[in-house]
Amino acid sequence: FNHNQDFGLVHLEAYMSLTSYNAIEEYFHFIVRAFDNLLEQLGTRGNRFEKWCNKLDGELLSEHHNQFLQGFVRLGTLIGYEPIRPKHQSATDCLWRGIFGNYKEIITFEAKIEHTPAGKIIASDIGQAHNQMARAISEYENLGYTIRSSVITHMSKLMPDAESSAGIIRIITKDSISELWETIRRLLTEYRNVWSPDDLNARRQSAESLKPKLPQTGWLIRALDYNARFITKDVLLSEWKQ
C-alpha cells in the first residue's frame, strides 16, 4: 500500500474546492498537478530535488541537440503540457500539446542550437517549421486545436530568403527558454518549501500561494502571436509574475 499514491488520488479534488469557480478550466490546476507529480517522485528531503534541477539546467544550456531536447521535454511536462517527440520520417523535433479544460493548443518546435557555417537561420530551417505546422494542422485542427510553429535557436539573424518565407513562424531565443526554466524553478522551489507529501493543508497553502504568480490559459500562444519575428525572454515571460 503506497500512502503517497493514495493521498495523490484525493488532493486534486481538494484543490478544486479552493475557489468558487471550476478550477479544472484554469491553467493553474495543471501546473499544480505537474508540480505535485514531480515532488511526489523527488520528495522534500535530501538532494534529489537539487540534482534534478541542476540536470535540467545543463540540458537546456547544452549545445547538443538531443540533450537539449531531453530537457525541453521535461520542461514542457513541468508546465502542464504533454510533450511529444514524433518518430516518423521528417518529424518535428518536439511538439507540445496542451489541453486545459476546453482550450486546446499545439506548438511545434524545431531546435537549431548547434553552430553552423552560416551562423544564421537558413531557408530550409524555416521550411521545416512550415512543414511541421502543416502536418499539425492536418492532424489536429479539426479537433479544435489552436496551432503555432516555432524555431528555437541561439542564432540572432535570418538569411534574407529565410526571413521572406517565414510568415507566421516565430523564432524563440534559446536564452528565453533558460529564463523560463529559471522562473519555473523559483516557483517550484517556493512551492516545495511549503508542500508536504502527507499534509493536505500544506498542499492547499502551497497551491494558494502559487496561483496569483501564474499566467492565464493560452499564455504561450499569445506570446507566439506577438508582432515580432524573435520571441525574446521579455515577450515569452510577459505574463509570468516576476
Where do the model's predicted regions map?
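Interdomain/boundary linker segments immediately adjacent to catalytic/signaling cores
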Residues: 2-63, 230-242
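Catalytic core segments in nucleotide and nucleic-acid processing enzymes
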Residues: 48-223
